[in-house]
């Protein structure tokens, strides 16, 4: 049976609101298959440990400066520089042409793309970082995903644990969405920028190309191509 000229094939359904492809260019990670079973973008956080357990083949091709600590459960690609004073506990998979600066602490279950900067006094745990992202100074990234060319200013904290120890939910404009996760920091979309000393609450979703002003506290869902501005007042008085 042939279609008449007035009939059309059905368009494919758009991906769900929180599908990984709505926030992340999956071509900008060597590990795109880890997202295959993730209906919601945060589902991938449950997969990192098992993915590394079965796929990681430890090897260090990096240029190692001085005597950083690198455990036996680590892969590091060519052209990456690991500076003296860095700690890579692992399991960790680090791509090529990265900078792992002095004082960086890479804990368990970390996947890092190519051309990434992981800086001084930054801590990473159970996270995926896409190609060309930069986290250069004094940040915490736990149970989170950072997209292609995402950037965190100095002192940005992606908080991953609620004060009341309850399950983390994603707060939408209508109703919270249960994640099934007790620890979940943030999804930071491709080319998103977060300014210095911002604090991002657990379960936050930041869309592609969005910008958050320094010193902001944010929780919830920030749509793509947004600017989240902080307005504060200061008052000068005479000192006596």
Residue positions per predicted region:
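Terminal amphipathic alpha-helical/low-complexity segments used for targeting or macromolecular assembly
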Residues: 1-67, 209, 215, 224-226, ...
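Residue-level "contact hotspot" at macromolecular interaction interfaces
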Residues: 73-75, 93, 111, 145, ...
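Glycine-rich active-site/cofactor-binding loop and its immediate structural neighborhood
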Residues: 76-117
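Glycine-rich hexapeptide-repeat left-handed beta-helix
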Residues: 31-35, 120, 126-240
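N-terminal short leaders/motifs
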Residues: 19-38, 71-73, 79, 85, ...
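Long amphipathic N-terminal alpha/beta scaffold segment
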Residues: 47-93
């Amino acid at each position: 049976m042939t279609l008449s000229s007035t009939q059309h094939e059905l368009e494919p359904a758009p991906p769900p609101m929180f599908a990984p492809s709505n926030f992340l260019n999956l071509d900008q990670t060597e590990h795109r298959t880890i997202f295959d079973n993730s209906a919601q973008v945060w589902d991938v956080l449950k997969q990192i440990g098992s993915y590394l357990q079965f796929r990681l083949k430890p090897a260090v091709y990096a240029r190692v400066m001085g005597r950083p600590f690198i455990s036996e459960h680590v892969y590091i690609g060519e052209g990456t520089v690991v500076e003296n004073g860095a700690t890579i506990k692992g399991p960790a998979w680090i791509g090529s042409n990265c900078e792992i600066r002095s004082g960086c602490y890479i804990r368990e279950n970390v996947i890092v793309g190519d051309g990434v900067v992981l800086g001084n006094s930054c801590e990473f745990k159970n996270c995926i970082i896409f190609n060309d992202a930069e986290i250069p100074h004094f940040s915490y990234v736990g149970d989170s995903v950072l997209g292609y060319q995402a950037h965190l200013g100095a002192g940005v904290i992606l908080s991953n644990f609620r004060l009341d120890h309850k399950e983390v939910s994603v707060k939408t404009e209508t109703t919270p969405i249960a994640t099934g996760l007790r620890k979940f920091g943030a999804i930071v979309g491709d080319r998103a920028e977060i300014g210095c000393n911002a604090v991002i609450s657990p379960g936050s979703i930041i869309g592609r190309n969005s910008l958050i002003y320094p010193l902001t506290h944010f929780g919830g869902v920030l749509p793509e191509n947004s600017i989240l501005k902080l307005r504060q007042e200061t008052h000068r008085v005479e000192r006596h």
